[in-house]
């Protein structure tokens, strides 16, 4: 399963299992060590972002790995990164892509995403502009009309700096608006997906429109469901599926995502987990159906940065 790929609407192949590089602790060297381990294990898809502030460590790990593994070429790797909210002005989109290339020490990016469907203002030093309340100052015009941002994304493809473009955290209404103006359709929509947030309607919409879903937080979250105190990892049905299969709960949840047909992006800084998360079994129909029953009717989102942004992408969930 680890070598499984999907085909993007560009015709490019994308590895179905990617390694998430968001560093929880952010300690210097943590990302370098984790990415090095991931590449050694066999991951060939790295999911990065300008906002993670560790692209330089990812780039160092990639450079050093390729130097000691002449059998692996840059084109064997699939590197994704993302533009942050305050860099949605066309000239900033292009700056962000070039800056990420420099930090990642690559000549091109395989997949470049608009990280959130929210445009924010920036300071003169290209830092995020904050209001008196400490929250982002929203650029309403670019948030409501993403066309200038998307045109800049398309121009990056035309220039060759970026091979494919897509979005992250976009809703069905947002995607519908984008598809109406896009000359180059988004190749992916990276969203939170796990058994407590199966996102059936959005996943189906993406597939119907030739957009490949990618699951971040595919293992759920360390957080509890606010209303019940339940954690994904403590769900008895999910634990039972893992126990009878002989695999870890993480492996089972990743297998569920692959069987649903989308990319999964596990992240870890623990070497043993980095390895086990790459060795994903084929899920039996019985086990798949058991997880589907857990997911049925659930809609618990763990990742919502509304308190940071001062803007809620999902107001209907309030």
UniProtKB/Swiss-Prot annotation:
GO molecular function, one term: glycerol 2-dehydrogenase (NADP+) activity
Catalyzed reactions per annotation: glycerol + NADP(+) = dihydroxyacetone + NADPH + H(+)
Keyword vocabulary terms for this entry: Glycerol metabolism, NADP, Oxidoreductase
Class in the EC hierarchy, top level: oxidoreductase
SUPFAM superfamilies, sorted: NAD(P)-linked oxidoreductase (SSF51430)
Highest taxon, organism lineage: Eukaryota
Active site residues according to the UniProt entry: 52 (proton donor)
Binding site for NADP(+): 217-277
PROSITE patterns per UniProt: ALDOKETO_REDUCTASE_1, ALDOKETO_REDUCTASE_3
Pfam families: Aldo_ket_red (PF00248)
Similarity comment: Belongs to the aldo/keto reductase family.
Function per UniProt: Glycerol oxidoreductase probably involved in glycerol synthesis.
Name this polypeptide is given: Glycerol 2-dehydrogenase (NADP(+))
Organism: Hypocrea jecorina
Gene responsible for this protein: gld2
């Amino acid at each position: 399963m680890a070598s499984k790929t999907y085909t993007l609407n560009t015709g490019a192949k994308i590895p179905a299992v990617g390694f998430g590089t968001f560093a929880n602790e952010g300690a210097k060297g943590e990302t370098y060590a984790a990415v090095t381990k991931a590449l050694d294990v066999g991951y060939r898809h790295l999911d990065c972002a300008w906002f993670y502030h560790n692209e330089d460590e990812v780039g160092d790990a990639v450079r050093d790995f390729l130097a000691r593994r002449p059998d692996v070429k840059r084109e064997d790797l699939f590197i994704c990164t993302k533009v942050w909210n305050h860099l949605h002005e066309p000239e900033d989109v292009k700056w962000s892509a070039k800056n990420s290339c420099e930090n990642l020490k690559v000549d091109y990016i395989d997949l470049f995403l608009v990280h959130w469907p929210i445009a924010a203002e920036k300071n003169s030093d290209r830092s995020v502009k904050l209001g008196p309340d400490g929250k982002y100052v929203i650029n309403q015009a670019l948030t409501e009309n993403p066309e200038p941002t998307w045109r800049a994304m398309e121009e990056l493809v035309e220039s060759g700096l970026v091979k494919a473009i897509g979005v992250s955290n976009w809703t069905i209404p947002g995607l519908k608006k984008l598809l109406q103006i896009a000359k180059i359709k988004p190749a992916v929509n990276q969203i939170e997906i796990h058994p407590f947030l199966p996102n059936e309607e959005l996943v189906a919409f993406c597939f119907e429109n030739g957009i490949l879903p990618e699951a971040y937080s595919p293992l759920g979250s360390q957080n509890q469901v606010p209303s019940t105190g339940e954690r994904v990892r403590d769900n008895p049905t999910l634990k039972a599926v893992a126990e009878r299969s002989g695999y870890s709960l993480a492996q089972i949840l990743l297998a569920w995502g692959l069987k649903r047909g989308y990319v999964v992006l596990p992240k870890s800084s623990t070497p043993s987990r980095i390895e086990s998360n790459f060795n994903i079994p084929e899920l039996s129909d019985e086990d798949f159906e058991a997880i589907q029953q857990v997911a049925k009717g659930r809609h618990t989102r763990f990742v919502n940065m509304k308190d940071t942004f001062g803007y809620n992408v999902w107001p209907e969930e309030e």
